[in-house]
């Protein structure tokens, strides 16, 4: 079997969760006998595994069906996740939902990162097979390492005794950044570090003010 992994605007989404999913999916499939291509011009594949939602993604799905190919959609996004993310996102969220549903309906099967996401998609009246499969992480990259711990503490000028709380994500409310800051203020005895970045011109004012310390 041959699978076409398609990611629209790879450079634009490279640092996002969706962008990193490409490498993880390629690595996961490397352990199987499945042949993988990322060439959108390929025509000899059996399954289109699509991860993005732009106009070109819509075109790829339609082309796949015309050629009699099967389509697996990776449901990274939902209406609920889109709301309260970017400035103005709530205004266009209903239209985004309609567009998402129109794409997901064209899939022969859908993969979601969590059972919760599967539940949300079922609420959109999608009847296809939906499989919740974690995006996963490369375990070897996050294995315990005294050397890395020392470098981390040296970089942030932390003593060996200091307790550190870490979170990773974009500056989105749904990522828990408001709760993270509230918790940090309540517990000054600990060091709180948030890893991640989003252009502050794109996020709601309450998030922007929070990051700027206003």
Please name every model-derived segment:
Residues 137, 191-213:
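Glycosyltransferase donor-sugar binding loop
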Residues 159-175, 181-187, 193:
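Conserved donor-binding/catalytic core segment of Leloir-type glycosyltransferases
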Residues 116, 136:
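Carbohydrate-associated surface elements
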Residues 66, 92-110:
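Membrane-proximal helix-turn-helix segments that form the acceptor-binding/catalytic region
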Residues 122, 137-154:
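Acidic anion/phosphate-binding donor-loop and adjacent secondary structure
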Residues 47-49, 63-82, 109-111, 131-132:
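Active-site proximal beta-strand in glycosyltransferases
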């Amino acid at each position: 079997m041959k699978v076409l992994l398609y990611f629209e605007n790879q450079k634009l989404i490279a640092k996002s969760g969706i962008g990193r999913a490409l490498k993880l999916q390629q690595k996961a499939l490397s352990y199987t006998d499945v042949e993988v291509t990322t060439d959108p011009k390929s025509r000899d594949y059996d399954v289109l595994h699509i991860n993005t939602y732009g106009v070109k993604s819509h075109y790829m799905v339609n082309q796949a069906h015309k050629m009699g190919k099967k389509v697996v959609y990776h449901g990274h996004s939902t209406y609920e996740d889109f709301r309260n993310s970017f400035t103005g996102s709530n205004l266009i969220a209903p239209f985004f939902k309609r567009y998402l549903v129109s794409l997901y309906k064209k899939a022969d099967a859908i993969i979601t990162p969590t059972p919760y996401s599967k539940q949300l998609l079922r609420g959109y009246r999608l009847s296809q097979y939906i499989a919740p499969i974690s995006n996963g992480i490369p375990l070897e990259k996050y294995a315990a390492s005294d050397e890395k711990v020392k470098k981390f503490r040296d970089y942030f000028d932390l003593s060996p005794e200091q307790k550190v709380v870490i979170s990773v994500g974009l500056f989105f409310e749904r990522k828990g950044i408001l709760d993270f800051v509230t918790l940090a203020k309540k517990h000054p005895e600990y060091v709180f570090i948030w890893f991640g970045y989003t252009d502050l011109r794109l996020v709601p004012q309450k998030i922007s003010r929070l990051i700027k310390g206003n």
